[in-house]
């Protein structure tokens, strides 16, 4: 009986896990910006975000695995210079939350590599969450 309770306790979060369905939107900016539109059946923004991170979408691995509970901006530079002039690659990750939305943007400002931008916006609407993911590279 004890094993059954443990099994039920472990499986309970899965009962509330939502279903994610995605379709690719138009590629814009001469093919360097990809758009994906997804719908997550559920109301948990963090669960929808984690479901999106599990998708095999180009650039999504750049988004942070863990989210802060509050709005935040994190900036950092690579510790070593990438050219003879001392330039360093810079990265900016921004998380913005409201009660019904979540936006995460990861901007790589390459000094020696091409800049990239990955952005995901989740909007709670009724019993589902509408998601727009965009990745740009130049």
Per-segment meaning from a language model:
Residues 2-3, 124:
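Basic side chains
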Residues 3-13:
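Sec-dependent N-terminal signal peptides
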Residues 17-138:
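Exposed acidic/polar residues on beta-strands and adjacent loops within beta-sheet cores, strongest
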């Amino acid at each position: 009986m004890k094993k059954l309770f443990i099994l039920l306790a472990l499986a309970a979060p899965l009962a509330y896990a939502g279903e994610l369905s995605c379709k690719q939107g138009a590629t814009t900016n001469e093919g360097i910006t990809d758009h994906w539109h997804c719908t997550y059946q559920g109301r948990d923004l963090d669960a929808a975000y984690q479901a999106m991170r599990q998708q095999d979408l180009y650039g999504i691995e750049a988004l942070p695995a863990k989210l802060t509970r509050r709005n935040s901006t994190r900036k950092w530079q690579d510790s070593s210079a990438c050219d003879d002039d001392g330039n360093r690659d810079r990265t900016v990750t921004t998380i913005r939350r409201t009660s019904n939305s979540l936006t995460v943007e990861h901007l790589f400002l390459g000094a020696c590599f091409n800049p990239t931008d990955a952005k995901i916006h989740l909007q709670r609407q009724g019993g589902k969450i509408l998601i727009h993911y965009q990745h740009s590279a130049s």
